[in-house]
């Protein structure tokens, strides 16, 4: 499970420099990232979304109290779904991580 955690944190580290939305190359696919602030029960929340429409219909989503938490958990949600469906192999994860470390 360590490689998947490393993959998530490598993606998050790269997406954290983007503010509310942006595009990101992930495993040779163009992916998109968006964070939207919302006000819920008298508190600010952030809705995160990570998706790669030219590659898969999988969408990672999360709502958290911090912007960074929304980024992390939407990526975590995407990677979990992609791993479960066999879309991302361990070798691909290792290669992606090695590009950024």
From Swiss-Prot:
What organism is recorded for this protein? Limulus polyphemus
* Gene3D superfamilies per UniProt: 3.30.160.320
Q: Which domain of life is it from?
A: Eukaryota
The disulfides recorded in the entry are 31-52
Quote the Pfam families the UniProt record gives.
Anti-LPS-SCYG
The protein depicted here goes by the name: Anti-lipopolysaccharide factor
Listed GO biological process terms: defense response to bacterium
Q: Where are the transmembrane segments?
A: none
User: What keywords would UniProt list here?
Assistant: Antibiotic, Antimicrobial, Disulfide bond
Query: Which purpose does this protein serve, as stated in its record?
Result: Binds tightly to LPS and thus specifically inhibits the LPS-mediated activation of the hemolymph coagulation. It has a strong antibacterial effect especially on the growth of Gram-negative bacteria.
Which InterPro entries does the UniProt record give? Anti-LPS_factor/Scygonadin, Anti-LPS_factor/Scygonadin_sf
């Amino acid at each position: 499970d360590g490689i998947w955690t490393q993959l998530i944190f490598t993606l998050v580290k790269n997406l954290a420099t983007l503010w509310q939305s942006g595009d990101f190359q992930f495993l040779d696919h163009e992916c998109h990232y968006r964070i939207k602030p919302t006000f819920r029960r008298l508190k600010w929340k952030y809705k995160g979304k990570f998706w790669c429409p030219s590659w898969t219909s999988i969408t990672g989503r999360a709502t958290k109290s911090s912007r960074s938490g929304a980024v992390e958990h939407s990526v975590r949600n995407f990677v979990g779904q992609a791993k479960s469906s066999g879309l991302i192999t361990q070798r691909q994860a290792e290669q992606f991580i090695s590009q950024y470390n």
